């Protein structure tokens, strides 16, 4: 019976697919762009995903085996302007109308990007096939020549101010002998190296101070690279050169509005920039992150400006956000068994409860279900509270000053009264969380989970007995222990543009700690075991 229903469902889906037109709404002479295909003729290992973003016109996305049902919905409208047609256009997705004028710019984009990747003299040929108002564009790519770096000459300012720091960093230089020459590699090295120098006091040094020139004529297929750091930028001349020097922090100002009622010590402790310290860009960024984690602030700005030939001033500007508020929510529901329900919820928050940036959250929830003309009913009540401190409590701050600190205490209670059982659930946790660069961590030295069951209906218990994990949640529990999570990612962007990797490790430990309280717990004379209740 089940297999027959599956066959019917597949048949209906196929019928809908076949009868669905994705070009019905197109005008005469128009076609829908269905696909962009990239084929690299001379290197099957080359990832076409590197150049796909540089094609200017993209086809509609697909969901099911290359089919987009929203295209069909849109095309139900045809050329009509009826109410149904307008609804179809609003709910559906319009087809991408093929535009042949976008092909030539796409070819130019691909060639330029291949040159950026180190393929010089690449060719791209585009061809279009159109059948029944459906167009497919194929880009045949022949990768150009690559040059191997056979040697590198470093040229630093004659003053020698960069020599010591540059030599200390040579092991981390990305451009090495034997690699393929590419603008992308040189640009990445410019960013990396300039960031390194700005960590070591060189406030004015940027990636635009880096110049590269390559000799590709002396040895066929190879390039001799000159790696130069100049005291003027790429859009300047030698007349604009300003000698590099190390800078130090001078005056530090923390500015915030009068309505920000917070202890000044809290703001000072979050600041990692101190007068007399050598300029370090990472310290500035870390200070910004620490202030941004403070929920009481709506905006944070850390401005660093040169004050004289060897010092900079830092101005930290803070803006206050809404301090407190509450939310009331009521939902009504019904189900096929005739049960009616109402679920009220009330939440309250305060972002500065003790005038130190502490965030208090309180939540009250309820769920009441009943059946008209019947005694069947259920009641669920819940309350939860949490407070978050913008620091590590009971932990030496200096040991973790590089991290964005947070300490959170949470507790909750949930009461459930149903015809099958009465259940009480209590949870509590005390823990630390923070982040440093690409690493995020959370550690709970203590966490508690208590489940207490009363008036269990044995018939109900038998119906769920086949599911071990579900059954375990309907027995008494008292779990007390510790736990934590470590998360590392290679990309911290909100919207990553490339693939990335991450590592996540979780651990929980519970049980043995309770044995410390055995002398205080009642003992069963028959079994010799201690019990909590």
For the regions a protein language model found, what residue spans apply to each?
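C-terminal motif of bacterial Sec signal peptides marking the signal peptidase cleavage site
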Residues: 16-19
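Predominantly transmembrane beta-strands of Gram-negative outer membrane beta-barrel pores used
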Residues: 327-334, 340-394, 408-413
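Transmembrane beta-strand segments of outer-membrane beta-barrel domains in Gram-negative
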Residues: 199, 323-325, 375-533
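Bacterial N-terminal signal peptides that target proteins for export
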Residues: 1-6
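Transmembrane beta-barrel architecture of outer membranes
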Residues: 224, 268, 286, 311-313, ...
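Beta-strand secondary-structure signal
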Residues: 111, 136-140, 224-228, 313-317, ...
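Periplasmic polypeptide-binding modules associated with outer-membrane biogenesis and secretion
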Residues: 21-334, 365-370
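Secondary-structure transition/capping motifs at alpha-helix termini
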Residues: 293-298, 318-324, 350-358, 394-395, ...
